[in-house]
Protein backbone atom coordinates (compact mmCIF):
# COMPACT_ATOMS: atom_id res chain seq x y z
CA UNK A 1 0.00 0.00 0.00
CA UNK A 2 2.89 2.35 0.78
CA UNK A 3 4.41 1.66 -2.64
CA UNK A 4 1.10 2.42 -4.37
CA UNK A 5 0.79 5.67 -2.43
CA UNK A 6 4.34 6.68 -3.43
CA UNK A 7 3.59 5.99 -7.09
CA UNK A 8 0.52 8.24 -6.97
CA UNK A 9 2.61 10.99 -5.33
CA UNK A 10 5.17 11.16 -8.16
CA UNK A 11 5.12 14.54 -9.93
CA UNK A 12 7.20 16.30 -12.60
CA UNK A 13 9.91 18.42 -10.96
CA UNK A 14 9.43 21.16 -13.59
CA UNK A 15 5.68 21.57 -14.17
CA UNK A 16 4.38 19.75 -11.03
CA UNK A 17 1.96 17.60 -13.04
CA UNK A 18 1.15 14.24 -11.49
CA UNK A 19 2.12 10.94 -13.06
CA UNK A 20 -1.42 10.12 -14.22
CA UNK A 21 -1.72 13.53 -15.96
CA UNK A 22 1.13 12.88 -18.41
CA UNK A 23 2.08 10.10 -20.84
CA UNK A 24 5.58 9.51 -19.49
CA UNK A 25 7.43 10.45 -16.33
CA UNK A 26 11.18 9.89 -16.54
CA UNK A 27 13.13 9.51 -13.30
CA UNK A 28 16.55 10.97 -12.58
CA UNK A 29 18.60 11.33 -9.38
CA UNK A 30 15.89 12.64 -7.01
CA UNK A 31 14.05 14.42 -9.87
CA UNK A 32 11.41 13.60 -12.48
CA UNK A 33 10.59 15.12 -15.87
CA UNK A 34 7.48 14.52 -17.96
CA UNK A 35 7.20 14.10 -21.74
CA UNK A 36 5.55 17.52 -22.12
CA UNK A 37 8.50 19.29 -20.48
CA UNK A 38 10.91 17.31 -22.66
CA UNK A 39 9.03 18.49 -25.78
CA UNK A 40 9.12 22.06 -24.50
CA UNK A 41 12.88 21.88 -23.87
CA UNK A 42 13.40 20.45 -27.36
CA UNK A 43 11.45 23.34 -28.90
CA UNK A 44 13.51 25.86 -26.91
CA UNK A 45 16.77 24.28 -28.13
CA UNK A 46 15.55 24.30 -31.74
CA UNK A 47 14.61 27.97 -31.45
CA UNK A 48 18.02 28.82 -29.99
CA UNK A 49 19.69 26.97 -32.87
CA UNK A 50 17.63 28.98 -35.36
CA UNK A 51 18.58 32.27 -33.68
CA UNK A 52 22.29 31.32 -33.59
CA UNK A 53 22.21 30.30 -37.25
CA UNK A 54 20.34 33.45 -38.27
CA UNK A 55 22.99 35.60 -36.57
CA UNK A 56 25.72 33.82 -38.55
CA UNK A 57 24.02 33.60 -41.96
CA UNK A 58 22.65 37.16 -41.86
CA UNK A 59 26.18 38.52 -41.57
CA UNK A 60 27.83 36.36 -44.25
CA UNK A 61 29.67 38.59 -46.74
CA UNK A 62 29.65 37.72 -50.44
CA UNK A 63 32.60 35.76 -51.91
CA UNK A 64 34.05 38.96 -53.39
CA UNK A 65 33.91 40.73 -50.02
CA UNK A 66 35.45 37.70 -48.27
CA UNK A 67 38.27 37.73 -50.84
CA UNK A 68 38.75 41.47 -50.35
CA UNK A 69 39.17 41.07 -46.59
CA UNK A 70 41.55 38.14 -47.09
CA UNK A 71 43.67 40.42 -49.29
CA UNK A 72 44.20 42.73 -46.29
CA UNK A 73 45.94 39.95 -44.36
CA UNK A 74 47.20 37.31 -46.82
CA UNK A 75 49.63 38.10 -49.63
CA UNK A 76 49.24 36.34 -52.99
CA UNK A 77 47.44 32.98 -53.27
CA UNK A 78 44.65 34.60 -55.35
CA UNK A 79 43.21 31.33 -56.69
CA UNK A 80 43.19 29.73 -53.22
CA UNK A 81 41.44 32.81 -51.79
CA UNK A 82 38.77 32.66 -54.48
CA UNK A 83 38.13 28.94 -53.93
CA UNK A 84 37.98 29.36 -50.14
CA UNK A 85 35.69 32.40 -50.34
CA UNK A 86 33.17 30.58 -52.55
CA UNK A 87 33.38 27.36 -50.49
CA UNK A 88 32.80 29.10 -47.15
CA UNK A 89 29.99 31.28 -48.53
CA UNK A 90 28.23 28.21 -49.97
CA UNK A 91 28.73 26.28 -46.72
CA UNK A 92 26.90 28.83 -44.57
CA UNK A 93 24.21 29.40 -47.21
CA UNK A 94 23.67 25.65 -47.12
CA UNK A 95 23.06 25.85 -43.37
CA UNK A 96 20.47 28.57 -43.92
CA UNK A 97 18.78 26.42 -46.57
CA UNK A 98 18.70 23.32 -44.33
CA UNK A 99 17.34 25.32 -41.39
CA UNK A 100 14.54 26.75 -43.56
CA UNK A 101 13.06 23.25 -43.84
CA UNK A 102 13.07 23.34 -47.64
CA UNK A 103 14.67 20.00 -48.46
CA UNK A 104 13.73 19.63 -52.14
CA UNK A 105 17.41 19.18 -52.96
CA UNK A 106 19.83 17.74 -50.41
CA UNK A 107 22.97 19.86 -50.18
CA UNK A 108 26.06 18.03 -48.94
CA UNK A 109 28.80 19.57 -46.84
CA UNK A 110 32.04 20.44 -48.65
CA UNK A 111 35.13 20.29 -46.46
CA UNK A 112 38.38 21.75 -47.78
CA UNK A 113 41.96 20.48 -48.24
CA UNK A 114 44.77 23.05 -48.55
CA UNK A 115 48.06 21.83 -50.01
CA UNK A 116 51.11 24.07 -50.04
CA UNK A 117 54.67 24.47 -48.77
CA UNK A 118 55.53 25.52 -45.22
CA UNK A 119 54.89 29.21 -44.57
CA UNK A 120 52.67 29.75 -47.63
CA UNK A 121 49.65 30.94 -45.62
CA UNK A 122 47.46 27.86 -45.05
CA UNK A 123 46.90 28.48 -41.34
CA UNK A 124 46.54 32.24 -41.77
CA UNK A 125 43.84 31.77 -44.41
CA UNK A 126 41.80 29.56 -42.07
CA UNK A 127 42.26 31.92 -39.09
CA UNK A 128 41.27 34.97 -41.15
CA UNK A 129 38.16 33.23 -42.49
CA UNK A 130 36.96 32.50 -38.96
CA UNK A 131 37.62 36.12 -37.97
CA UNK A 132 35.64 37.41 -40.97
CA UNK A 133 32.65 35.16 -40.25
CA UNK A 134 32.80 35.63 -36.46
CA UNK A 135 32.28 31.92 -35.79
CA UNK A 136 34.01 29.65 -33.23
CA UNK A 137 37.36 28.47 -34.58
CA UNK A 138 39.95 26.01 -33.37
CA UNK A 139 43.16 24.50 -34.69
CA UNK A 140 44.48 21.00 -34.15
CA UNK A 141 47.77 19.34 -35.03
CA UNK A 142 47.18 15.99 -36.72
CA UNK A 143 50.57 14.69 -35.53
CA UNK A 144 49.35 14.58 -31.91
CA UNK A 145 46.28 12.48 -32.73
CA UNK A 146 46.13 8.71 -32.33
CA UNK A 147 43.48 6.05 -32.67
CA UNK A 148 41.27 5.61 -29.58
CA UNK A 149 42.91 3.48 -26.89
CA UNK A 150 46.51 4.49 -27.64
CA UNK A 151 48.81 7.12 -26.14
CA UNK A 152 48.01 10.51 -27.67
CA UNK A 153 44.97 12.70 -28.26
CA UNK A 154 41.59 11.31 -29.31
CA UNK A 155 39.87 13.03 -32.24
CA UNK A 156 37.04 14.02 -29.86
CA UNK A 157 39.49 16.41 -28.17
CA UNK A 158 39.36 18.54 -31.33
CA UNK A 159 35.62 18.99 -30.78
CA UNK A 160 36.28 19.83 -27.13
CA UNK A 161 38.56 22.70 -28.22
CA UNK A 162 35.78 24.01 -30.46
CA UNK A 163 33.35 23.86 -27.54
CA UNK A 164 35.83 25.82 -25.40
CA UNK A 165 36.22 28.40 -28.21
CA UNK A 166 32.43 28.83 -28.24
CA UNK A 167 32.31 29.05 -24.42
CA UNK A 168 30.36 25.78 -24.40
CA UNK A 169 27.56 27.25 -26.49
CA UNK A 170 26.62 24.06 -28.35
CA UNK A 171 24.49 25.84 -30.96
CA UNK A 172 27.42 28.11 -31.93
CA UNK A 173 29.98 25.29 -31.81
CA UNK A 174 27.90 23.27 -34.27
CA UNK A 175 28.37 26.07 -36.85
CA UNK A 176 32.10 26.56 -36.25
CA UNK A 177 35.28 25.91 -38.25
CA UNK A 178 37.98 23.36 -37.38
CA UNK A 179 41.41 23.59 -39.00
CA UNK A 180 43.50 20.40 -38.86
CA UNK A 181 47.15 21.14 -39.66
CA UNK A 182 49.89 18.72 -40.74
CA UNK A 183 47.27 16.34 -42.15
CA UNK A 184 49.91 14.93 -44.50
CA UNK A 185 51.66 13.46 -41.44
CA UNK A 186 48.78 10.99 -40.88
CA UNK A 187 49.29 9.38 -44.28
CA UNK A 188 49.60 5.61 -44.03
CA UNK A 189 53.09 4.24 -44.28
CA UNK A 190 52.54 2.42 -47.59
CA UNK A 191 49.96 2.43 -50.35
CA UNK A 192 48.98 -1.17 -49.61
CA UNK A 193 46.83 -1.93 -46.52
CA UNK A 194 48.98 -3.04 -43.59
CA UNK A 195 48.46 -6.12 -41.43
CA UNK A 196 49.78 -4.29 -38.34
CA UNK A 197 47.87 -1.35 -36.84
CA UNK A 198 48.90 2.12 -37.97
CA UNK A 199 47.52 4.01 -34.95
CA UNK A 200 48.91 7.46 -35.83
CA UNK A 201 48.37 7.22 -39.59
CA UNK A 202 45.54 5.30 -41.18
CA UNK A 203 43.95 4.78 -37.73
CA UNK A 204 43.59 8.56 -37.28
CA UNK A 205 42.15 8.94 -40.78
CA UNK A 206 39.53 6.31 -39.96
CA UNK A 207 38.71 8.06 -36.66
CA UNK A 208 38.26 11.41 -38.42
CA UNK A 209 35.88 10.06 -41.07
CA UNK A 210 32.69 10.16 -39.02
CA UNK A 211 33.13 13.58 -37.42
CA UNK A 212 34.11 15.12 -40.78
CA UNK A 213 31.12 13.63 -42.58
CA UNK A 214 28.66 14.45 -39.82
CA UNK A 215 27.69 12.57 -36.68
CA UNK A 216 26.49 13.19 -33.14
CA UNK A 217 29.75 12.84 -31.21
CA UNK A 218 30.08 12.32 -27.46
CA UNK A 219 32.55 14.96 -26.29
CA UNK A 220 34.16 14.68 -22.82
CA UNK A 221 34.08 18.25 -21.40
CA UNK A 222 37.11 17.58 -19.15
CA UNK A 223 39.19 15.55 -21.62
CA UNK A 224 38.63 11.92 -22.47
CA UNK A 225 41.21 9.89 -20.59
CA UNK A 226 41.79 11.53 -17.21
CA UNK A 227 38.11 11.67 -16.24
CA UNK A 228 36.43 8.52 -17.56
CA UNK A 229 33.34 8.87 -15.30
CA UNK A 230 32.31 12.34 -16.53
CA UNK A 231 29.09 13.15 -18.39
CA UNK A 232 29.44 13.63 -22.14
CA UNK A 233 28.27 16.58 -24.26
CA UNK A 234 26.47 15.58 -27.47
CA UNK A 235 27.74 17.63 -30.43
CA UNK A 236 26.36 17.34 -33.97
CA UNK A 237 29.23 17.78 -36.46
CA UNK A 238 27.03 17.81 -39.59
CA UNK A 239 27.38 21.59 -40.02
CA UNK A 240 30.95 22.07 -38.77
CA UNK A 241 33.30 23.09 -41.59
CA UNK A 242 36.58 21.14 -41.60
CA UNK A 243 39.62 22.65 -43.31
CA UNK A 244 42.68 20.39 -43.52
CA UNK A 245 46.13 21.61 -44.46
CA UNK A 246 49.53 20.10 -45.12
CA UNK A 247 52.79 20.59 -47.01
CA UNK A 248 52.65 17.09 -48.58
CA UNK A 249 56.40 16.98 -49.12
CA UNK A 250 57.24 14.60 -51.96
CA UNK A 251 53.83 14.59 -53.64
CA UNK A 252 55.34 16.58 -56.52
CA UNK A 253 57.47 13.51 -57.35
CA UNK A 254 54.31 11.35 -57.44
CA UNK A 255 52.61 13.84 -59.80
CA UNK A 256 55.71 14.09 -62.00
CA UNK A 257 55.99 10.30 -62.18
CA UNK A 258 52.34 10.01 -63.25
CA UNK A 259 52.49 12.78 -65.85
CA UNK A 260 55.77 11.48 -67.32
CA UNK A 261 54.37 7.94 -67.46
CA UNK A 262 51.31 9.18 -69.33
CA UNK A 263 53.47 10.98 -71.91
CA UNK A 264 55.72 8.07 -72.89
CA UNK A 265 56.18 7.81 -76.64
CA UNK A 266 57.99 9.34 -79.60
CA UNK A 267 56.29 12.71 -79.10
CA UNK A 268 56.93 12.87 -75.34
CA UNK A 269 58.81 15.87 -73.99
CA UNK A 270 61.04 14.36 -71.29
CA UNK A 271 62.31 17.74 -70.07
CA UNK A 272 58.90 19.35 -69.57
CA UNK A 273 58.74 18.80 -65.79
CA UNK A 274 62.32 19.96 -65.23
CA UNK A 275 61.22 23.45 -66.24
CA UNK A 276 58.28 23.48 -63.82
CA UNK A 277 58.47 24.59 -60.21
CA UNK A 278 56.60 22.84 -57.42
CA UNK A 279 53.63 25.22 -57.61
CA UNK A 280 53.06 24.45 -61.29
CA UNK A 281 53.42 20.70 -60.68
CA UNK A 282 50.85 20.80 -57.84
CA UNK A 283 48.27 22.29 -60.22
CA UNK A 284 48.20 18.89 -61.97
CA UNK A 285 47.19 17.14 -58.71
CA UNK A 286 44.70 14.27 -59.02
CA UNK A 287 42.92 12.13 -56.41
CA UNK A 288 45.12 9.14 -57.29
CA UNK A 289 48.21 11.17 -56.28
CA UNK A 290 46.78 11.70 -52.79
CA UNK A 291 46.02 7.97 -52.57
CA UNK A 292 49.59 7.08 -53.54
CA UNK A 293 50.84 9.57 -50.95
CA UNK A 294 48.99 7.66 -48.23
CA UNK A 295 45.52 9.16 -47.75
CA UNK A 296 42.77 6.53 -47.80
CA UNK A 297 40.03 7.01 -50.46
CA UNK A 298 37.31 7.45 -47.81
CA UNK A 299 39.26 10.31 -46.20
CA UNK A 300 39.85 12.01 -49.55
CA UNK A 301 36.12 11.67 -50.26
CA UNK A 302 35.35 13.80 -47.16
CA UNK A 303 37.46 16.62 -48.64
CA UNK A 304 35.80 17.38 -52.00
CA UNK A 305 37.37 20.83 -52.38
CA UNK A 306 41.14 20.68 -52.90
CA UNK A 307 43.22 23.78 -53.56
CA UNK A 308 46.97 24.29 -53.80
CA UNK A 309 48.99 27.26 -52.59
CA UNK A 310 51.95 28.73 -54.46
CA UNK A 311 55.48 28.97 -53.15
CA UNK A 312 56.24 32.53 -52.02
CA UNK A 313 58.98 34.35 -53.93
CA UNK A 314 61.21 37.17 -52.64
CA UNK A 315 58.84 39.97 -53.65
CA UNK A 316 55.92 38.24 -51.92
CA UNK A 317 57.94 37.87 -48.71
CA UNK A 318 58.88 41.57 -48.77
CA UNK A 319 55.20 42.44 -49.21
CA UNK A 320 54.32 40.19 -46.26
CA UNK A 321 56.86 42.06 -44.15
CA UNK A 322 55.43 45.51 -44.92
CA UNK A 323 51.96 45.67 -46.49
CA UNK A 324 49.25 43.65 -44.64
CA UNK A 325 47.33 45.16 -41.71
CA UNK A 326 49.22 42.86 -39.37
CA UNK A 327 52.56 43.10 -41.21
CA UNK A 328 55.47 41.84 -39.13
CA UNK A 329 57.55 45.02 -39.47
CA UNK A 330 54.53 47.15 -38.48
CA UNK A 331 54.16 45.04 -35.34
CA UNK A 332 57.80 45.60 -34.34
CA UNK A 333 57.52 49.31 -35.15
CA UNK A 334 54.57 49.54 -32.76
CA UNK A 335 56.56 47.77 -30.04
CA UNK A 336 59.39 50.30 -30.44
CA UNK A 337 56.86 53.14 -30.40
CA UNK A 338 55.60 51.95 -27.00
CA UNK A 339 59.14 52.58 -25.71
CA UNK A 340 59.27 56.09 -27.29
CA UNK A 341 61.57 54.76 -30.01
CA UNK A 342 61.47 54.39 -33.79
CA UNK A 343 62.36 51.53 -36.10
CA UNK A 344 63.53 52.14 -39.67
CA UNK A 345 64.44 49.32 -42.07
CA UNK A 346 66.16 49.87 -45.43
CA UNK A 347 64.67 48.19 -48.48
CA UNK A 348 67.99 46.42 -49.09
CA UNK A 349 67.68 44.96 -45.59
CA UNK A 350 64.18 43.68 -46.38
CA UNK A 351 65.51 42.00 -49.52
CA UNK A 352 68.24 40.27 -47.52
CA UNK A 353 65.75 39.11 -44.86
CA UNK A 354 63.52 37.65 -47.60
CA UNK A 355 66.50 35.90 -49.20
CA UNK A 356 67.45 34.34 -45.87
CA UNK A 357 63.89 33.03 -45.37
CA UNK A 358 63.93 31.55 -48.89
CA UNK A 359 67.29 29.88 -48.22
CA UNK A 360 65.90 28.28 -45.05
CA UNK A 361 62.76 27.14 -46.94
CA UNK A 362 60.57 28.37 -44.08
CA UNK A 363 58.43 30.74 -46.15
CA UNK A 364 56.65 33.55 -44.32
CA UNK A 365 56.88 31.66 -41.02
CA UNK A 366 60.65 32.21 -40.88
CA UNK A 367 60.48 36.00 -41.26
CA UNK A 368 59.53 36.68 -37.65
CA UNK A 369 62.36 34.57 -36.21
CA UNK A 370 64.91 36.37 -38.41
CA UNK A 371 63.62 39.79 -37.32
CA UNK A 372 63.42 38.74 -33.67
CA UNK A 373 67.09 37.73 -33.79
CA UNK A 374 68.08 41.02 -35.48
CA UNK A 375 66.16 43.26 -33.08
CA UNK A 376 66.75 41.46 -29.79
CA UNK A 377 69.68 43.61 -28.59
CA UNK A 378 67.98 46.82 -29.76
CA UNK A 379 64.76 46.01 -27.89
CA UNK A 380 66.87 45.18 -24.84
CA UNK A 381 68.53 48.63 -24.92
CA UNK A 382 65.75 51.02 -26.01
CA UNK A 383 63.58 50.08 -23.04
CA UNK A 384 66.16 51.88 -20.85
CA UNK A 385 67.45 54.59 -23.18
CA UNK A 386 64.13 55.81 -24.67
CA UNK A 387 63.93 58.35 -27.53
CA UNK A 388 66.08 56.24 -29.87
CA UNK A 389 65.88 55.61 -33.60
CA UNK A 390 67.03 52.13 -34.63
CA UNK A 391 68.02 51.68 -38.28
CA UNK A 392 68.46 48.25 -39.86
CA UNK A 393 70.57 48.02 -43.03
CA UNK A 394 71.69 45.19 -45.28
CA UNK A 395 75.00 45.05 -43.40
CA UNK A 396 73.13 44.62 -40.10
CA UNK A 397 71.13 41.70 -41.51
CA UNK A 398 74.34 40.07 -42.75
CA UNK A 399 75.90 40.41 -39.30
CA UNK A 400 78.66 42.81 -40.41
CA UNK A 401 77.64 45.69 -38.12
CA UNK A 402 75.36 46.33 -35.14
CA UNK A 403 71.95 48.04 -35.58
CA UNK A 404 72.45 51.81 -35.90
CA UNK A 405 71.05 53.69 -32.89
CA UNK A 406 70.68 57.49 -32.89
CA UNK A 407 69.06 59.75 -30.32
CA UNK A 408 65.79 61.38 -31.35
CA UNK A 409 66.42 64.21 -28.87
CA UNK A 410 69.60 65.31 -30.66
CA UNK A 411 67.91 65.47 -34.07
CA UNK A 412 66.63 68.84 -35.30
CA UNK A 413 63.15 67.48 -35.94
CA UNK A 414 61.24 64.91 -33.98
CA UNK A 415 59.07 64.19 -37.01
CA UNK A 416 58.78 60.44 -37.42
CA UNK A 417 60.52 58.81 -40.36
CA UNK A 418 58.77 56.20 -42.48
CA UNK A 419 58.76 52.74 -40.98
CA UNK A 420 60.74 51.54 -43.99
CA UNK A 421 63.24 53.60 -45.95
CA UNK A 422 63.89 53.58 -49.69
CA UNK A 423 61.03 51.31 -50.79
CA UNK A 424 60.63 51.53 -54.56
CA UNK A 425 57.21 52.65 -55.76
Swiss-Prot record:
UniProt entry tagged with the keyword Cell cycle: no
- Name a single GO biological process: cell division
A GO cellular component annotated for this chain's UniProt record is:
HslUV protease complex
Q: Which Pfam families match?
A: AAA_2, ClpB_D2-small, zf-C4_ClpX
What positions does the domain ClpX-type ZB occupy? 1-53
Amino-acid positions noted as binding Zn(2+) in the UniProt annotation, renumbered to this chain: 12, 15, 34, 37
User: Which GO terms of the molecular function aspect are on file?
Assistant: ATP binding; ATP hydrolysis activity; ATP-dependent protein folding chaperone; protein dimerization activity; unfolded protein binding; zinc ion binding
- Sorted UniProt keywords: ATP-binding, Chaperone, Metal-binding, Nucleotide-binding, Zinc
Residues binding ATP are 117-124
Q: Supply the PANTHER family for this chain.
A: ATP-DEPENDENT CLP PROTEASE ATP-BINDING SUBUNIT CLPX-LIKE, MITOCHONDRIAL, ATP-DEPENDENT CLP PROTEASE ATP-BINDING SUBUNIT CLPX-LIKE, MITOCHONDRIAL-RELATED
The family classification in the record reads: Belongs to the ClpX chaperone family.
Its assembly, as annotated, is: Component of the ClpX-ClpP complex. Forms a hexameric ring that, in the presence of ATP, binds to fourteen ClpP subunits assembled into a disk-like structure with a central cavity, resembling the structure of eukaryotic proteasomes.
Function per UniProt: ATP-dependent specificity component of the Clp protease. It directs the protease to specific substrates. Can perform chaperone functions in the absence of ClpP.
* Name listed for the protein in its UniProt record: ATP-dependent Clp protease ATP-binding subunit ClpX
Gene that produces this protein:
clpX
Amino acid sequence: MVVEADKKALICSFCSKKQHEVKKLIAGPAVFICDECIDLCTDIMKEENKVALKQITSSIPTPQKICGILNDYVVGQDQAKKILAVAVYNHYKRLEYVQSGNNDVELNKSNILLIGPTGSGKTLLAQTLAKILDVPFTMADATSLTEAGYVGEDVENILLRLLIASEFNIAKAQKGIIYIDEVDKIARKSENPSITRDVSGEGVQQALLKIMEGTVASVPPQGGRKHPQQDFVQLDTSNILFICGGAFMGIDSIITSRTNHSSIGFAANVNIDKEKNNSEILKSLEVEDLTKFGLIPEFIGRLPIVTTLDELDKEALITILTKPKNAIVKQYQKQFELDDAELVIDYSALETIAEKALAKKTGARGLRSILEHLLLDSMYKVAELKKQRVTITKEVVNGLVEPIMTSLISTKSNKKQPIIADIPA
